[in-house]
Amino acid sequence: MVHSSMGAPEIRMSKPLEAEKQSLDSPSEHTDTERNGPDINHQNPQNKASPFSVSPTGPSTKIKAEDPSGDSAPAAPPPPQPAQPHLPQAQLMLTGSQLAGDIQQLLQLQQLVLVPGHHLQPPAQFLLPQAQQSQPGLLPTPNLFQLPQQTQGALLTSQPRAGLPTQPPKCLEPPSHPEEPSDLEELEQFARTFKQRRIKLGFTQGDVGLAMGKLYGNDFSQTTISRFEALNLSFKNMCKLKPLLEKWLNDAETMSVDSSLPSPNQLSSPSLGFDGLPGRRRKKRTSIETNVRFALEKSFLANQKPTSEEILLIAEQLHMEKEVIRVWFCNRRQKEKRINPCSAAPMLPSPGKPTSYSPHLVTPQGGAGTLPLSQASSSLSTTVTTLSSAVGTLHPSRTAGGGGGGGGAAPPLNSIPSVTPPPPATTNSTNPSPQGSHSAIGLSGLNPSAGPGLWWNPAPYQP
């Protein structure tokens, strides 16, 4: 009993000893796990290629090698714990990459709205390295980044294309009118050509104005067409009129070509002008050659108003129409009146009517010619002087009382018979006498019978 009682305490004593031994062994195991825990943490970053397949064999073998007699069950669960935080970290990285891609897309869209048409690849290149540098945890998983990079590259290539239609169209310069002339020389050339072709077609300037009013709804006056042909309009107005006149000219020429082949309807219908207007077409203008014009000028200098027979003769000589020659002479006479209006109507006395008195003209001796007033007065003064000298010599000179007679007075002059012919009737008319003699002028004031108080010395008579 004593032995049994002694044995019991020994057994009891042994159990605490074994418990103490186990407690002593367990701290070593805890220290091993504590010592190996950081190693596992250090080894996990080294095995970066496969973060999802973490093998706990290394730590478990260590624990078994250090304490093969110890129980390995409680030491196995701690190693998988460090692998669990990597899964949320990878998910965070994926979400971070998606956020970076969304931010990049927003930036690209903002740039598209603000600055359309610019290339967006340089800011994307700056964004990608920054995202890669700010997320170093994404480097051990390159396969996870292939899809976002491809989608971002596709966005880079597709978004500028989508932005192309949104670009505002460039302000194009207004196209210049194809018929607008560039300078004044072209306008001058067109004005000359237009006038020649209009005359060739037989249209007047008024016809052109009416036809253009019929076509374009705005009547142009004959003055406007005339000023256009004479280049008397402003450059702007001529530029506006040029395409309209050119279109009318082309239409008129086309119509004249078509009308050169008469149809039955045209033969039966009355003559119509351009665009259905009543026939106002005139005869084509006749162009007279230079040699014919010289011949007509010579004929005009010879006779300004030929008769009908003379006009017919001139037309046969020049191989022209009689009406053309007649119109030319009429126009030439009008031109002569404008150039020299005085020579057109010479003042010739008619044989049956008495000539009217003019202060500038005097008709001596039958009115054969005209003499100026100064020449007529000089001839009259010469005649008066001759007559007065002849009268003075015919009268006897006054004699004083002589001797031997007792101082008798001389007889009066009126008792002496006068041999002076009676003066004709005095008149101031300058009309010629029927005998063609000079006009008689009263010489009553020059009569020598008035006494000795003469105001001239009579010349001696020389028979």
From Swiss-Prot:
<feature type="compositionally biased region" description="Pro residues">
    <location>
        <begin position="75"/>
        <end position="85"/>
    </location>
</feature>
<feature type="DNA-binding region" description="Homeobox">
    <location>
        <begin position="281"/>
        <end position="340"/>
    </location>
</feature>
<dbReference type="InterPro" id="IPR017970">
    <property type="entry name" value="Homeobox_CS"/>
</dbReference>
<dbReference type="GO" id="GO:0005634">
    <property type="term" value="C:nucleus"/>
</dbReference>
<feature type="compositionally biased region" description="Gly residues">
    <location>
        <begin position="400"/>
        <end position="409"/>
    </location>
</feature>
<feature type="region of interest" description="Disordered">
    <location>
        <begin position="1"/>
        <end position="87"/>
    </location>
</feature>
<dbReference type="Pfam" id="PF00157">
    <property type="entry name" value="Pou"/>
</dbReference>
<dbReference type="GO" id="GO:0048469">
    <property type="term" value="P:cell maturation"/>
</dbReference>
<dbReference type="InterPro" id="IPR000972">
    <property type="entry name" value="TF_octamer"/>
</dbReference>
<dbReference type="InterPro" id="IPR010982">
    <property type="entry name" value="Lambda_DNA-bd_dom_sf"/>
</dbReference>
<keyword id="KW-0805">Transcription regulation</keyword>
<dbReference type="GO" id="GO:0043565">
    <property type="term" value="F:sequence-specific DNA binding"/>
</dbReference>
<keyword id="KW-0804">Transcription</keyword>
<dbReference type="GO" id="GO:0001228">
    <property type="term" value="F:DNA-binding transcription activator activity, RNA polymerase II-specific"/>
</dbReference>
<dbReference type="GO" id="GO:0032755">
    <property type="term" value="P:positive regulation of interleukin-6 production"/>
</dbReference>
<dbReference type="InterPro" id="IPR009057">
    <property type="entry name" value="Homeodomain-like_sf"/>
</dbReference>
<keyword id="KW-0539">Nucleus</keyword>
<feature type="compositionally biased region" description="Polar residues">
    <location>
        <begin position="41"/>
        <end position="60"/>
    </location>
</feature>
<dbReference type="GO" id="GO:0098586">
    <property type="term" value="P:cellular response to virus"/>
</dbReference>
<keyword id="KW-0371">Homeobox</keyword>
<feature type="region of interest" description="Disordered">
    <location>
        <begin position="159"/>
        <end position="182"/>
    </location>
</feature>
<dbReference type="GO" id="GO:0006355">
    <property type="term" value="P:regulation of DNA-templated transcription"/>
</dbReference>
<feature type="region of interest" description="Disordered">
    <location>
        <begin position="259"/>
        <end position="282"/>
    </location>
</feature>
<comment type="function">
    <text>Transcription factor that specifically binds to the octamer motif (5'-ATTTGCAT-3'). Regulates IL6 expression in B cells with POU2AF1. Regulates transcription in a number of tissues in addition to activating immunoglobulin gene expression. Modulates transcription transactivation by NR3C1, AR and PGR.</text>
</comment>
<keyword id="KW-0238">DNA-binding</keyword>
<dbReference type="GO" id="GO:0000978">
    <property type="term" value="F:RNA polymerase II cis-regulatory region sequence-specific DNA binding"/>
</dbReference>
<dbReference type="GO" id="GO:0003677">
    <property type="term" value="F:DNA binding"/>
</dbReference>
<feature type="region of interest" description="Leucine-zipper">
    <location>
        <begin position="373"/>
        <end position="394"/>
    </location>
</feature>
<dbReference type="InterPro" id="IPR001356">
    <property type="entry name" value="HD"/>
</dbReference>
<dbReference type="GO" id="GO:0005654">
    <property type="term" value="C:nucleoplasm"/>
</dbReference>
<protein>
    <recommendedName>
        <fullName>POU domain, class 2, transcription factor 2</fullName>
    </recommendedName>
</protein>
<dbReference type="GO" id="GO:0015606">
    <property type="term" value="F:spermidine transmembrane transporter activity"/>
</dbReference>
<dbReference type="GO" id="GO:0000976">
    <property type="term" value="F:transcription cis-regulatory region binding"/>
</dbReference>
<dbReference type="InterPro" id="IPR013847">
    <property type="entry name" value="POU"/>
</dbReference>
<dbReference type="GO" id="GO:0019904">
    <property type="term" value="F:protein domain specific binding"/>
</dbReference>
<feature type="domain" description="POU-specific">
    <location>
        <begin position="179"/>
        <end position="253"/>
    </location>
</feature>
<feature type="compositionally biased region" description="Basic and acidic residues">
    <location>
        <begin position="12"/>
        <end position="37"/>
    </location>
</feature>
<comment type="similarity">
    <text>Belongs to the POU transcription factor family. Class-2 subfamily.</text>
</comment>
<keyword id="KW-0010">Activator</keyword>
<keyword id="KW-0963">Cytoplasm</keyword>
<dbReference type="GO" id="GO:0045944">
    <property type="term" value="P:positive regulation of transcription by RNA polymerase II"/>
</dbReference>
<dbReference type="InterPro" id="IPR000327">
    <property type="entry name" value="POU_dom"/>
</dbReference>
